C-alpha cells in the first residue's frame, strides 16, 4: 500500500465515534482501498453517509475487519449485508470476506425459520434500497411464500366451522425449513414491503385466498383501525393499500371489516377509487350484514364518537345496493327480502338510542318503508321500532308523536299487530282510532270474502247435484234398454231351443220311417236339414216381428 496511508480512520456513525485501521479496512473493502489509493481521505471519512447504518451494526463490521470475535443476528444481518455489498467486501477482494459470511448466515440460519425471516425483513427495511440490484427482497419474499404455501396458518388462524377438524394437513412436499408455532406476524413488516409481498403471493396462486384475505384484514386492524389518530397520513396510505389487496369476491371478507374500512376511508379522505372499491364490495353482500354492521357506518369518528350520527352514509349504502342489483332475478329477490329485514332490524336498534333525533328516526323509517315496499307482507317491524322509539323518547309532544307515526301503514299490520297497536297507550289517539277503523274494515272484507266463498261453494255443489241427477236419469234409461235387450235375448234363446227340439224330434221319426222304406239318402238328408233351417229362420222372423 502507499506510504501516504494514515494508520487511523475516524468515522462518526450517528454520533458514535469509531477509530479504524485504514490498512485493515482496505484489505477487506475494495471501495476503501480505491479511495486510499487516490488519497481521498475526506471522502473516506464520509464513506457511510449514503447508508442507513446504526452504531451496533457498524461495530460488527469493525470487529470483523480487526479480526475480533463477532456474531450475526437476524436483526442486523440485512444491514451487515448492505454495508458489505456497498464497501465491496467480497471474495474478489479477500477470501472469507464479510459478504460471503453474511450470505451464508442468511441462507442457513435465517431463511429456514419463518420468524427469523420476518424479523430480518422488518429490521432491514431501510437497507433494502441499496440491495435492489442484487434482488435480495425477492429472495426474502419467495422464502416466505414457500413457507406459507406449505402451511397457510403462518398467516393466521381462520375461524373454523364445526364440521372442520383441528388437524391441518400441509402440502405433501419436502420440508426445507422449520415451522414456528409462536411465529412473528407478517403484518409487522413495513407497508412498503407488505404490499409488494402480498402482490407477489397473490400472483403465485400457491396460498389459499382465504389466508391472503385474513392477513390483509389483520393488517387493516393493526395499522388503520387501532393506531393513533395523529398518524392520519400513514393510515390513509394503509387503507388504500388494503383496498387494492382485497378481492371483490362475495362473502370472503367480513361485513364488519368492510363497513369499518369504508368509514375510515371517508374519514381519512382516501382516494375516490378506494372509497368506491369498499362501497362495491359492501353492495355485493349487504344482504349478509347485521344491524350492528350498519351501526358502524352511522357511528361518528374518534374514541368519543356516539352511534347513529351519520344516517346519510347508511342511506347511501342501501341506495347503492339497489342500484347495484338493478336487474332483478330469482336470486336478487331473496337479497331484497334480507335487506328489507335488515333495515327493520337496524331501525329497531336505532330506536332504542336516546340520543337519536326525531328527524333521523323518521328518515330511517321512510327508508325502511321504501325498501320493504312490495317485498315484506307486513309492517309489524316498523311498528315495533316506533313503539321502542316512543318508549325511549317519552318527552315527545302529541304532534311529534304523529310525525313519528306517519310512516306506519296500518293496513299492513298483522292481526297480532292490530291487537297490540289498539291497546298501545303510547300511540297518539288518532293513530289508535285509525288502527281500529282499518281493523274493522279488514274484518268486514274478510267476512264478505268468506260469505262470497261459501255462496260460490253452495252454487258449485248445486251444479254438481244437477249434473249428478241428469247422469242418474241417463243411467236409468240405459239400464232399462239393456234390461229389455237382455229379456229379448233370453226369449229368443228359449224359443230357438224349443223349436230345435221339435224339429229334431220330427226329423228323427221321419228318418226312421225312411230307413224302414230304404229310401233315406244324402239328398233327402240335406233337404231335411234345409227344411229345418228354413223353419228356424221363419220362426226367427216371427220372433223379431213379435218384439217389434
From Swiss-Prot:
Gene3D superfamilies: Potassium Channel Kv1.1, Chain A (3.30.710.10). InterPro entries: BTB/POZ_dom, NPH3/RPT2-like, NPH3_dom, SKP1/BTB/POZ_sf. The BTB/POZ domain mediates the interaction with some component of ubiquitin ligase complexes. May act as a substrate-specific adapter of an E3 ubiquitin-protein ligase complex (CUL3-RBX1-BTB) which mediates the ubiquitination and subsequent proteasomal degradation of target proteins. Residues 442-493 form a coiled coil. Pfam families: BTB, NPH3. The modification Phosphotyrosine is found at residue 383. Pathway: Protein modification; protein ubiquitination. It comes from the Eukaryota. Residues 7-74 form the BTB domain. GO terms for biological process: protein ubiquitination. PROSITE patterns: BTB (PS50097), NPH3 (PS51649). It comes from Arabidopsis thaliana (Mouse-ear cress). Belongs to the NPH3 family. Residues 180-442 form the NPH3 domain. Keywords: Coiled coil, Phosphoprotein, Ubl conjugation pathway. This is BTB/POZ domain-containing protein At5g17580.
Amino acid at each position: 500500500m502507499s506510504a501516504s496511508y494514515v494508520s487511523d480512520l475516524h468515522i462518526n456513525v450517528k454520533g458514535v465515534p469509531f477509530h479504524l485501521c485504514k490498512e485493515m479496512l482496505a484489505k477487506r473493502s475494495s471501495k476503501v482501498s480505491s479511495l486510499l489509493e487516490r488519497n481521498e481521505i475526506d471522502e473516506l471519512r464520509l464513506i457511510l453517509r449514503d447508508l442507513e447504518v446504526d452504531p451496533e451494526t457498524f461495530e460488527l463490521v469493525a470487529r470483523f475487519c480487526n479480526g475480533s470475535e463477532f456474531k450475526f443476528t437476524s436483526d442486523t444481518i440485512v444491514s451487515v449485508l448492505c454495508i458489505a455489498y456497498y464497501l465491496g467486501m467480497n471474495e474478489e477482494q479477500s477470501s472469507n470476506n464479510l459478504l460471503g459470511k453474511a450470505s451464508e448466515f442468511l441462507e442457513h440460519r435465517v431463511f429456514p425459520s419463518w420468524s427469523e425471516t420476518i424479523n430480518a425483513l422488518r429490521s432491514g427495511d431501510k437497507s433494502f434500497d441499496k440491495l435492489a440490484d442484487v434482488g435480495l427482497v425477492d429472495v426474502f419474499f419467495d422464502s416466505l411464500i414457500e413457507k406459507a404455501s406449505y402451511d397457510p396458518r403462518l398467516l393466521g388462524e381462520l375461524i373454523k366451522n364445526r364440521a372442520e377438524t383441528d388437524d391441518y394437513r400441509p402440502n405433501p412436499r419436502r420440508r426445507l425449513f422449520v415451522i414456528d408455532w409462536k411465529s412473528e406476524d407478517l403484518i409487522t413488516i413495513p407497508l412498503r414491503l407488505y404490499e409488494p409481498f402480498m402482490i407477489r403471493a397473490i400472483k403465485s396462486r400457491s396460498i389459499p385466498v382465504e389466508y391472503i384475505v385474513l392477513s390483509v384484514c389483520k393488517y387493516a386492524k393493526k395499522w388503520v383501525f387501532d393506531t393513533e389518530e395523529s398518524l392520519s397520513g400513514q393510515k390513509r396510505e394503509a387503507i388504500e393499500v388494503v383496498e387494492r389487496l382485497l378481492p371483490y369476491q362475495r362473502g370472503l371478507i367480513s361485513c364488519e371489516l368492510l363497513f369499518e374500512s369504508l368509514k375510515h376511508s371517508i374519514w381519512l379522505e382516501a382516494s375516490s377509487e378506494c372509497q368506491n372499491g369498499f362501497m362495491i364490495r359492501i353492495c355485493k353482500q349487504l344482504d349478509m350484514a347485521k344491524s350492528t354492521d350498519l351501526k358502524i357506518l352511522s357511528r361518528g369518528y374518534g374514541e368519543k364518537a356516539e352511534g347513529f350520527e351519520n344516517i346519510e352514509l347508511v342511506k347511501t349504502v342501501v341506495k347503492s345496493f339497489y342500484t347495484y342489483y338493478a336487474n332483478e332475478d330469482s336470486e336478487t329477490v331473496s337479497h331484497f327480502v334480507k335487506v328489507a329485514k335488515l333495515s327493520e332490524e337496524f331501525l329497531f336498534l336505532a330506536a332504542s338510542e336516546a340520543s337519536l333525533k326525531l328527524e333521523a328516526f323518521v328518515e330511517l323509517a321512510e327508508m325502511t318503508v321504501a325498501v320493504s315496499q312490495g317485498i315484506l307482507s307486513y309492517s309489524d317491524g316498523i311498528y315495533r321500532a316506533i313503539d321502542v322509539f316512543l318508549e325511549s323518547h317519552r318527552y315527545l309532544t302529541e304532534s311529534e308523536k304523529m310525525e313519528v307515526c306517519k310512516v306506519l301503514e296500518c293496513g299492513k299490520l298483522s292481526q297480532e299487530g292490530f291487537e297490540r297497536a289498539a291497546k298501545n297507550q303510547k300511540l297518539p289517539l288518532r293513530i289508535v282510532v285509525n288502527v281500529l277503523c282499518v281493523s274493522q274494515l279488514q274484518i268486514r272484507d274478510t267476512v264478505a270474502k268468506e260469505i262470497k266463498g261459501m255462496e260460490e261453494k253452495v252454487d258449485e255443489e248445486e251444479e254438481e247435484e244437477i249434473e249428478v241427477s241428469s247422469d242418474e236419469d241417463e243411467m236409468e234409461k240405459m239400464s232399462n234398454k239393456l234390461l229389455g235387450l237382455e229379456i229379448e235375448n233370453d226369449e229368443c234363446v228359449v224359443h230357438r231351443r224349443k223349436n230345435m227340439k221339435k224339429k229334431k224330434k220330427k226329423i228323427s221319426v221321419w228318418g226312421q220311417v225312411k230307413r224302414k222304406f230304404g229310401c233315406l239318402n244324402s239328398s233327402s238328408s240335406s233337404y231335411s236339414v234345409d227344411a229345418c233351417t228354413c223353419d228356424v229362420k221363419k220362426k226367427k222372423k216371427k220372433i223379431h216381428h213379435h218384439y217389434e
